[in-house]
Curated annotation (Swiss-Prot):
The lineage of its organism: Bacteria, Bacillati, Actinomycetota, Actinomycetes, Mycobacteriales. One of its GO terms (molecular function) is glycine hydroxymethyltransferase activity. (6S)-5,6,7,8-tetrahydrofolate binds at L118, G122, H123, L124. InterPro entries: PyrdxlP-dep_Trfase, PyrdxlP-dep_Trfase_major, PyrdxlP-dep_Trfase_small, Ser_HO-MeTrfase, Ser_HO-MeTrfase-like, Ser_HO-MeTrfase_PLP_BS, SHMT-like_dom. GO terms for cellular component: cytosol. Belongs to the SHMT family. Its cofactor is pyridoxal 5'-phosphate. It holds the Pfam family SHMT. Catalyzes the reversible interconversion of serine and glycine with tetrahydrofolate (THF) serving as the one-carbon carrier. This reaction serves as the major source of one-carbon groups required for the biosynthesis of purines, thymidylate, methionine, and other important biomolecules. Also exhibits THF-independent aldolase activity toward beta-hydroxyamino acids, producing glycine and aldehydes, via a retro-aldol mechanism. It comes from the Bacteria. It comes from Mycobacterium avium (strain 104). Keywords: Amino-acid biosynthesis, Cytoplasm, One-carbon metabolism, Pyridoxal phosphate, Transferase. This is Serine hydroxymethyltransferase.
Length: 426
């Protein structure tokens, strides 16, 4: 029981060490990824992993929950206070589980759901035909303007009036602009629909007061905790008090059994951190870095190589890069940046002609580097590295670019001493 991981399972310990090395030595720019503080790692790796706690605080189906009840209540209270919500459920294991619970609570199978098309930046759980949401519900989609790549609220209203959905989703996985939540709420009211906002990507910006909050406008709001919020991989649901009972029962027993109490403890820690000035500063650097990146990727040298920025810029933590006129497709560009030590993900651009495993775009995000400590100077440097790589393609001096990446990574050490604590138990 007391032997460290390195002694019990050197294979897994070795792989964890290699992954730690990868995270330290490269620049993480996948928009949905971040680095959690050591306090979050400690909470998630705690003895709470041993405890079953089906039900809600004060109404459990197991004994011995006197301490985990307090932990969950702290997490719920912090979520409500941070976002100004009437209620919070912190039990969802993931964002997808949270979204499934929201749909389960607000709709019955066969009813109509209106969301942003996956091909235009929506998410799998917003009605994609191979996802549960697309199989259980009658789904309609709105999209972006083919020229501006912005959501046209007049077009959303027209679609809602025609389709008459039971629920309208406002949220995205790859859309670089702020949504008009008041307009979505007005449309939902006009057609008699419920408004659900999925703020998984921008919740940290909302918490810091740097992005409009959907909470005053939406009936229900879902989010992950691990993107801009910088917490453990998990989800939570917020909303109006009138939906608390149906949401709670949709999570348990509707979608899940026992909650992961060690993860809920880690959520509580992350939510506390999200109320600090240090967190707000990180979010300001996240936004500034994304704008620096968008501006550099709009430069003449990059444009000459057929690379452009979708919608002409960004309001959030990510930049969507259009490679349709470039010699590179999304997969090739992802691989190219991987070679120089920058991790991004290929991503479809609006109405992408290429298949989803190839794509014609990249999604590039700044949260993880802001968490690591990057400011404007460092974001300017990494933006220039990316621009140089994409403009030069396979003809770029990859060794020189890799050296620049290595210097940036070394200037911002990550998880110093973590091997002693996490792998060998010292």
């Amino acid at each position: 029981m007391s032997a460290p991981l390195a002694d019990i399972d050197p294979d897994i310990a070795g792989l964890l060490g290699q992954e730690l090395g990868r995270q330290r030595d490269t620049l993480e720019m996948i928009a949905s990824e971040n680095f959690v503080p050591r306090a979050v790692l400690q909470a998630q790796g705690s003895v709470l992993t041993n405890k079953y706690a089906e039900g809600l605080p004060g109404r459990r189906y197991y004994g011995g929950c006197e301490y985990v009840d307090v932990v969950e209540n702290i997490a719920r209270d912090r979520a409500k206070a941070l976002f100004g919500a009437d209620f919070a459920n912190v039990q969802p294991h993931s964002g997808a589980q949270a979204n499934a619970a929201v749909l389960h609570a607000l709709m019955t199978p066969g009813e109509r759901l209106l969301g942003l098309d996956l091909a235009n930046g929506g998410h799998l759980t917003h009605g994609m035909k191979l996802n549960f949401s697309g199989k259980l519900y009658d789904v309609g989609f709105y999209g972006v303007d083919p020229t501006t790549h912005l959501i046209d609220m007049d077009a959303v209203r027209a679609k809602a009036l025609e389709f008459r959905p039971k629920v309208i989703i406002a949220g995205w996985s790859a859309y670089p602009r702020v949504l008009d939540f008041a307009a979505f709420a007005s449309i939902a009211d006009e057609v008699g629909a419920k408004l659900w906002v999925d703020m998984a990507h921008f919740a940290g910006l909302v918490a810091a007061g740097l992005h409009p909050s959907p909470v005053p406008h939406a009936d229900v709001v879902s989010t992950t905790v691990h993107k801009t919020l910088g917490g453990p991989r998990s989800g939570l649901i917020l909303g109006k008090q009138e939906y608390a009972k149906s949401i709670n029962s949709a999570v348990f027993p509707g979608q899940q059994g026992g909650p992961l109490m060690h993860v809920i403890a880690a959520k509580a820690v992350a939510l506390k951190i999200a109320g600090t000035e240090e967190f707000a500063d990180r979010q300001r650097r996240t936004l500034s870095g994304a704008r620096i990146l968008a501006e550099r990727l709009s430069g003449a040298d990059v444009a000459a190589a057929g690379v452009s920025v979708v919608s002409g810029g960004t309001d959030v933590h990510l930049v969507l890069v259009d490679l349709r006129n470039s010699e590179l497709d999304g997969q090739a560009a992802e691989d190219l940046l991987h070679e120089i030590g920058i991790t991004v993900n290929r991503n479809a651009v609006p109405n992408d002609p290429r298949p989803p495993m190839v794509t014609s775009g990249l999604r590039v995000g700044t949260p993880a580097l802001a968490t690591r400590g990057f400011g404007d100077a460092e974001f300017s440097e990494v933006a220039d590295v990316i621009a140089t790589a994409l403009a030069g393609g396979r003809g770029a001096d990859l060794a020189a670019l890799r050296d620049r990446v290595t210097r940036l990574a070394r200037d911002f050490p990550l998880y110093e001493g973590l091997e002693d604590w996490a792998l060998v138990g010292r």
